[in-house]
Regions:
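ATP-dependent carboxylate-amine ligase
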Residues: 1-13, 55-62, 69-223
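Extended acidic/charged loop-beta regions that coordinate divalent cations
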Residues: 1-36
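Generic structural motif
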Residues: 20-23, 35, 44, 98, ...
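A short glycine/serine-rich beta->alpha loop
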Residues: 36-44, 90-92
């Protein structure tokens, strides 16, 4: 940006992503300051995170090869595109907690090349935020452009989440509203699609992970 009157303009960048080579729902390749990098998590928002990490590393004179090695040794962690198997289903668990974050995750799922079941878990505890009206500001209408075969809603505010996805225009005959997370997990196991995305608010994510650990789908550690 630049003002034609006073000359006020965007300052020269110290660190810059100059090329986005490829991006998928599980990885991205890009160029920062003439160095090639790859991260093993999906979505544009994680490239912003990577740019921040590279900027700090370069400030401390860490070589690009060392930075790239660090990226390759990192992996999706606790609730941040964490993947695990539920029976024969490949599940990805992603934390959502506000409209901007939810929209970024929906954009990331748009990159999935395969059909999937979408699970949305909405709680309203203090750690989640007791006001859940933010789901109406999130662009859940995007689900109609995704390869979603079925939606399962759960959590304390499961019925509100079900209403939100119905209002989005998604086929209500393909929405299952579940009162318990145990029922949600049972429904996941019954789905025809091989892939499942689970979007959960914070305490719903913790409760789901506890249930998954009880059934030995994940360990109980926050890695």
């Amino acid at each position: 940006y630049i003002c034609q009157n006073c000359g006020f303009s965007r300052p020269k960048l110290d660190y810059c992503l100059s090329d986005l080579t490829s991006i998928t729902n599980t990885s991205a390749n890009f160029v920062i300051d003439d160095a090639n990098y790859q991260i093993n998590v999906g979505g544009l928002y994680n490239i912003y995170n990577a740019l921040a990490a590279v900027s700090v590393a370069e400030f401390f004179d860490i070589a690009p090869a060392v930075i790239e090695k660090g990226f390759q040794q990192s992996h999706a962690v606790f609730g941040r595109q964490e993947t695990f198997k539920v029976g024969d289903k490949t599940c990805t668990l992603v934390l959502i907690k506000n409209p901007v974050g939810a929209n970024q995750v929906l954009d990331m799922m748009k990159l999935a090349p395969y059909p999937f079941t979408l699970v949305t878990l909405l709680n309203a505890n203090y750690a989640d935020g007791i006001d859940t009206s933010w789901i109406w500001d999130a662009d859940f209408e995007l689900i109609n452009a995704l390869k979603v075969e079925h939606i399962i809603t759960g959590g304390v505010r499961h019925s509100e989440m079900a209403r939100r996805v119905r209002v989005s225009g998604f086929d209500e005959n393909k929405i299952s509203d579940s009162e318990t997370l145990s029922d949600v997990l049972d429904l996941i196991e019954q789905q025809a699609s091989d892939h499942v995305y689970i979007l959960a608010t914070y305490t719903a994510m913790l409760e789901m992970r506890d249930l998954l650990a009880t059934r030995h789908y994940v360990n109980g550690e926050m890695k």
